[in-house]
């Protein structure tokens, strides 16, 4: 008797997405099969490494040893991020940039970095079915990548708008998939999953909103939260109890806390253990 196909949707949320390491590790240890992995942003990074056969313990160790904020050019705080974006905008008012015509050095470096976690493989080389969600900067469309080099697809999904330039994949310029689909459970469903484990690592709404920057950040968070809620409700209508939504308790870990790998991974482990019996009963 064949079992239902199991898919996992790993959401975006910056450093909070390190929780995916813990979730995947427990599922692996407990023998829960994953037939399909779909990732957005950090979910694409961790999901890609998993699909490429990277040992999760080694992945956690390597990520913990790196200063990813510096390596990826990502600020350590929201205030610094705004300053970085403002500085780039001011600079390009006078100098311009030809990123559409010529790939920038930073883009090449980003792809090379992610090749370390994808072992230089292509989607076609993977034993586990894998898909990456990105957004087309020109059309605003969701783009689901399932072929070609893994490193470029992952880089496209994980680019931070304003910090990194859009990445060309085929004839499209792509950016962070979290803009359009933060928890891609619907993509997993479309690709054939009959049971979907959705891992939502989105940051909560800010408790205090005082500055203009706070207002902008909060508005974006509200919009993303509502879009995620609607998408998950639609998947729930199709799957019922076969949609399992995890929301790890990631207090104290912000989207920019790229040095909190192990802390986030442990929280992911704790969250998935609450649902193991439910998931196994569905198989």
Regions found by a protein language model. Give the residues of each.
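Patatin-like phospholipase
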Residues: 1-40, 48-283
